[in-house]
Each structure stands twice: as C-alpha cells, then as structure tokens.
Amino acid sequence: MTGNMTDAPHGMISARPVMPPGGPPFMTQLYLIRHGENIDGKVDGAGPTVDLGLSERGRDQVARLSRRLMQSPSIKPSVLISSTERRASETAKLLGSACGLDVTERRAFEEWRSDDGTIEPDAFMAQWRAVKERDRAFHRFQPQSETQAEFFARVGAALHAVSEEHAGGSVLIVTHGGFIQAAFRHFFGFGDASFRRAYPAAAHASITHWRAEEGSDRWVLAYSNDVRHLEADGPA
C-alpha cells in the first residue's frame, strides 16, 4: 500500500498519500456503512427467524451517523445505495432523509445468503464446524442458499460495478458486516486463508472508506470501522 501509514484514533487505519500541486486528485470514494443494530426474531412467535428492522438503539446509532455526515467537511456523497434487506433499507432511508439523498436499493449489496432463517443458530454453527475447512467456501447450507465462494464473487462484482458506474463520485453504500469484511478480500486481493487468522471489525453504523485516484489501479483504505460518532454522551 502506498502512502505514509500512521497510527489513527479508534483503531482505524489511515493512509495519507502526498497530494500533487494544484489540489487533490480526481477520486472515486466509496463509504461502506454497516446498518444500525437490528432485531432478529419470528413473526408472531412462529416461522423462520427474520429481520424485524432497526432496534431503538439502532435508530439512535443512525441518528448519530446522520448528524456526523451532515456536519462533515470531507464526506460529501452524491449517491446513496442500499441493500434491500430491512435493517439496511431503514438505515438508508433515515440517512437519505437527513442528507437529502434518494435511496437506490440493490440486492447485490445484501448480506451472505447462507440460509433462509429456518436453521437455528446452534444448528447452523454445528453444521459449519462439521464441514472440512477446505470445503467450507463451497458448502451450501440449503439447496437455495449461496455458498461463501459465490458470496465473495458477488461482493467483488458489486463493488467493481458501482466504482465504474460512479467513477470520480462519492458514494454511500449501506450494507452488512459480512459484505464489508468481504470487501477487504476484494480490494486487497486476499485469498481464502486470510480470514482464518484475522478479520476486520465492522460495528453497527460504522464507516469504512475506500478511495481510488484517477488513473490508478490501486485502492487505498483511508480508514475502517470508524464509530467516533457513537462515542459522544447522550442521545443524538
């Protein structure tokens, strides 16, 4: 990675490349936002476990994030894209209302479609642990579900497409923890073994900022898992 790597607050990574004379370069900037805290449960106590939308705490997290975005001198998005899943959609609509942006929803930015909610968490993990490590990327929990390898390919394709579509623009993408983690694989070119040793954190309502200069074939991780807006005392 190019640039002078320095310690940054809140456990973030900061890359500060030297700017050319005449001002900052033409950049494509992607801000990956994880949705606020949500509630998972069964409708009327029956059926599969589903996303019931943002919790009260989640709405407060998004309100704090909205206030930060409105006050930020550096984050100036012109496009707001969201996963179609309820927790992300609700987050994006709150952000869009605060920032004056219309929301475009796309299924490509959804979380890993590992199962349909009918597998209980303990049973899911038991099945996962029973699969040989070399086979996990290709394991399908249910006939209609997405393998991990398919998920990683979807993430890469979605990020490539949006960066081409909005080249030179500043884009907010409201998505999920798994998607944000998989984005590190895409941008850094990590292989399957990378996340067996460590993985990046992606807290609720966090910001992870990637940028690319015009003419460069490399992306720069400006910062990740930035939640400074959640650390102030009191309600947003």
Report residues per predicted region:
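Acidic, low-complexity terminal tails and accessory targeting/binding regions
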Residues: G3-T28, T104-E105, E111-A123, G169, ...
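Active-site-proximal alpha-helix that buttresses catalytic centers in soluble enzyme cores
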Residues: D7-P17, G22-T28, I33-E105
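Generic beta-sheet signal
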Residues: L30, V162, G169-G178
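Active-site metal-binding loops of divalent metal-dependent hydrolases
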Residues: G36, G177, N225-V227
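Glycine-rich phosphate-binding loop signature in dinucleotide/nucleotide-binding domains
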Residues: S72-K76, V162-G169
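Short beta-strand scaffold positions
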Residues: S82-S83, A153, V174-T175
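Phosphate-handling substructures
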Residues: G96-A157, A222-Y223, A236
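GST superfamily/GST-like fold recognition
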Residues: G177-Q181, V220
